[in-house]
Amino acid sequence: MTARFADTWFFLALLDEHDQHHRRVADYAGSSADLMVTTRWVLAETANGLAASQHRAAVAEFLQSMENDPNVKLINESDALYRRGLELFAGRSDKEWSLTDCISFVVMKDEELR
C-alpha cells in the first residue's frame, strides 16, 4: 500500500461540492487504495475553512470518521513537531507557506512521503 499525504487543499476540495477540483479529488478518494497520511493541524485548518453553518454538520461527521478509518494515518500534535514546523516557517520568509503547511512538510519528510 502506498502512503500519500493529504493536505488541507485535498480535504477542502473533497468536502465542498462547489470546489472546482471536487470531482477529481472525490474520484481519487473513492478509488484509491493508498494509505492517507495527514495531521490534526490539517484537519483543524480544513474545519476552519468550512466552518460556515451549511457545512458544519457534514464536516464534523467527516472529521470524526477520520479517527477510526484504517486507511488513514492521523499524526497527532506534539510540541516537538510544532517547534520543527515553526522553525521551518520562520526560516523560509521567501515562501508564503502557512504554519500548517510547514508542519505538513516536516511530517512528509519524516514519513518519507511526496
Where are these regions (language model features)?
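Short loop->beta-strand "edge-of-pocket" segments that line small-molecule binding or catalytic clefts
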Residues: 35-37, 70-73
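Acidic active-site catalytic centers that drive phospho-/nucleotidyl reactions
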Residues: 7, 45, 101
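Alpha-helix boundary recognition
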Residues: 30, 64-68, 90, 109
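Short glycine/serine- and small hydrophobic-enriched flexible loop segments
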Residues: 48-51, 109
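Active-site neighborhoods of divalent-metal-dependent phosphate/nucleic-acid chemistry enzymes
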Residues: 73-114
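Short amphipathic alpha-helical interaction patches enriched in hydrophobic/aromatic residues
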Residues: 12, 50, 70-71, 89-93
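Short, well-structured N-terminal submotif of metal-dependent ribonuclease cores
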Residues: 1-38, 51-64
